């Protein structure tokens, strides 16, 4: 079984202080709809939507248009990783240890079917995978505004989502690691738990929408909403 966990747990205040970005419309649909629809595929058997409690009812209103019975909306946690933890706990009695859990940022509405399928293919081989693209710019370690080190670019990747894991690996990792607040993505939790995480090549177009400018940069001419 392939399970998609889509995270909308944050408030998106860098996008707008008054209007959560998942409800902003472009091309006739909300960001939430654009992202969720990328996972309405026959090879996705269950979808868990994780949302901030403030926006639970509004999210349910948007999602009720999808008649599939295998879409569940649950509450997120105080940080991204606690939102993932809530999903991991919710899934405990719904899926088996060998099922695949595909975790995706709700703010990445341009993920392609090909990237999702590559995640599924690789997780069946390796158990834990992360979508990533090679960095194109030189990266420096900086401390007190002084460059300390410039690592070779060939070793550096920008991590994206989906990040996909066998449920047994995800469950054991989130049980083992207690200081979740220091982690910013799921692959780092699994890595800290001692598992190897393999790379799935992503796409530059799979950007995370953080500010209004991100939408304008990819050619969205009109954004609807009280922003």
Curated annotation (Swiss-Prot):
GO terms for biological process: isopentenyl diphosphate biosynthetic process, methylerythritol 4-phosphate pathway. PROSITE patterns: ISPD. The gene is ispD. The keyword Transferase applies. HAMAP family: IspD. Pathway: Isoprenoid biosynthesis; isopentenyl diphosphate biosynthesis via DXP pathway; isopentenyl diphosphate from 1-deoxy-D-xylulose 5-phosphate: step 2/6. Belongs to the IspD/TarI cytidylyltransferase family. IspD subfamily. Catalyzes the formation of 4-diphosphocytidyl-2-C-methyl-D-erythritol from CTP and 2-C-methyl-D-erythritol 4-phosphate (MEP). One of its GO terms (molecular function) is 2-C-methyl-D-erythritol 4-phosphate cytidylyltransferase activity. It is an enzyme of class 2 (transferase). The record marks 14, 21 as: Transition state stabilizer. InterPro entries: IspD, IspD/TarI, IspD/TarI_cytidylyltransf_bact, ISPD_synthase_CS, Nucleotide-diphossugar_trans. It comes from the Bacteria. This is 2-C-methyl-D-erythritol 4-phosphate cytidylyltransferase. Its EC number is 2.7.7.60. It catalyses: 2-C-methyl-D-erythritol 4-phosphate + CTP + H(+) = 4-CDP-2-C-methyl-D-erythritol + diphosphate. The record marks 153, 208 as: Positions MEP for the nucleophilic attack. Keywords: Isoprene biosynthesis, Nucleotidyltransferase, Transferase. Pfam families: IspD.
């Amino acid at each position: 079984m392939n399970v998609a966990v889509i995270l909308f747990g944050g408030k998106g205040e860098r996008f707008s202080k008054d209007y959560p970005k998942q409800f902003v419309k472009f091309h006739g649909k909300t960001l939430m709809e654009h992202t969720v629809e990328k996972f309405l595929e026959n090879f996705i058997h269950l979808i868990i939507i994780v949302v901030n409690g403030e926006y639970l009812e509004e999210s349910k209103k948007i999602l009720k248009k999808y008649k599939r019975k295998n879409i569940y909306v649950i509450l997120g946690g105080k940080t991204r990783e606690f939102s993932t933890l809530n999903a991991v706990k919710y899934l405990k009695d719904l899926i088996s240890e060998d099922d695949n859990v595909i975790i995706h940022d709700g703010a990445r509405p341009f993920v392609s079917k090909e990237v999702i399928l590559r995640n599924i293919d690789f997780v069946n081989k390796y158990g834990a995978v992360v979508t990533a693209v090679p960095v194109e710019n030189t990266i420096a370690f900086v401390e007190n505004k002084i460059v300390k080190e410039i690592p070779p670019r060939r070793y550096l990747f920008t991590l994206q989502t989906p990040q996909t894991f066998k449920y047994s690996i995800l469950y054991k990792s989130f049980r083992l690691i207690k200081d979740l607040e220091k982690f910013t993505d799921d692959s780092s939790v699994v890595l800290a738990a001692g598992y190897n995480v393999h790379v799935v090549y992503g796409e530059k177009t799979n950007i995370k929408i953080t500010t209004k400018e991100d939408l304008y940069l990819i050619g969205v001419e009109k954004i609807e909403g009280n922003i």
